[in-house]
UniProtKB/Swiss-Prot annotation:
E.C. number(s) listed in UniProt: 5.4.99.25
Protein name: tRNA pseudouridine synthase B
Entry keyword set: Isomerase, tRNA processing
SUPFAM superfamilies found in the cross-reference section: Pseudouridine synthase (SSF55120)
Catalytic activity: uridine(55) in tRNA = pseudouridine(55) in tRNA
Organism name: Streptococcus pneumoniae serotype 4 (strain ATCC BAA-334 / TIGR4)
Length: 292
């Protein structure tokens, strides 16, 4: 069994939980996911099965799209709605929506983020959330990410001394939307957190086409495997090249070939089928991963 699954992850489930359950449903151990989702986040979780597990790193490289809600008025340990409140700054007057939108615009393009303590980023061989649960604070390395689009998608609503609005973000891999929410709050002068989040697109897969675990289990029971997408969709943003029969033969034998290309990595096709991922070495391309 080989292919890519567009899984609709539910709230309360880790990405690892989803993989574990799919292994049981599909009866295979060779399964991985293309981009972690926090337990409280719902939406698209790309799943690679069989040969497609070799595509995971490229699936992760493609941009992701999220829709969610930001709450101004208090912040939490985890930077989302599940965490303990650590700071409060009551919203006592109506916010200027123009200033809010200007602050949002200032967080687009290449930006620097510091990963939250409650995250799976590793420092000195340990995940940050392990330090956090032990009550330890460690220095976290900055990381460069890109926010391609960040926009407010609703009027600002008010609930007591809190203000809320929904948003849409298109971003690069490694972006923490929780941290983006907190950083926006700081620019506006308020403690803030991400109060809801849905991933609507990842690895070229869309939420409206995603299937829940129960739906996949029903299809497997009925002998229907139409939920498995071909490996080709996992090539993400890689430039695609179509090889001649002679070039394809050379690639199958692991030999270098000459191509009129400049990109560091290429997705090489034979007819309509993904044959290999090629890596530039000097003026030639070497097969990095061969699929057939």
């Amino acid at each position: 069994m080989n292919g890519i699954i567009n899984l609709k992850k539910e709230a309360g489930m880790t990405s690892h939980d989803a993989v574990f359950k799919l292994r049981k449903i599909l009866g295979t151990k060779k399964i991985g996911h293309g981009g972690t989702l926090d337990p409280d986040v719902v939406g698209v979780l790309p799943i690679a099965v069989g040969k497609a597990t070799r595509m995971v790193e490229f699936m992760q490289d493609e941009g992701k799209i999220y829709e969610g809600e930001i709450t101004l008025g208090y912040s939490t340990k985890t930077e989302d709605a599940s965490g303990e409140v650590v700071a409060e700054t009551p919203v006592l007057s109506l916010l200027d929506e123009k200033l809010v939108d200007e602050a949002i615009a200032s967080l687009t393009g290449p930006i620097t983020q510091i990963p939250p303590m409650y995250s799976a980023v590793k420092v000195n061989g340990r995940k940050l959330y392990e330090y956090a649960r032990a009550g330890q604070e460690v220095e976290r390395p900055e990381r460069q990410v890109t926010i391609y689009q960040f926009e407010r998608t609703s009027p600002i609503s008010y609930d007591g001394q809190l203000a809320r609005f929904t948003f849409r973000v298109k971003c690069s891999k490694g972006t923490y939307i929780r941290t983006l929410s907190v950083d926006l709050g700081e620019k506006l002068g308020y403690a803030a957190h991400m109060s809801h989040l849905t991933r609507t697109s990842a690895a070229g897969l869309q939420l409206e086409d995603a299937l829940a675990l129960e739906e996949i289990a029903e299809k497997v029971e009925a002998g229907q495997l139409d939920f498995l997408h071909p490996l080709e969709i996992g090539t993400g943003d890689l430039v695609k090249v179509f090889l001649s029969p002679e070039e394809a033969t050379e690639v199958r034998f692991g030999r270098f070939i000459e191509l009129d290309q400049t990109d560091k990595e290429l997705a090489a096709f034979e007819d309509d089928k993904l044959l290999a991922i090629l890596e530039k070495r000097g003026n030639l391309y070497k097969p990095r991963k061969v699929f057939s």
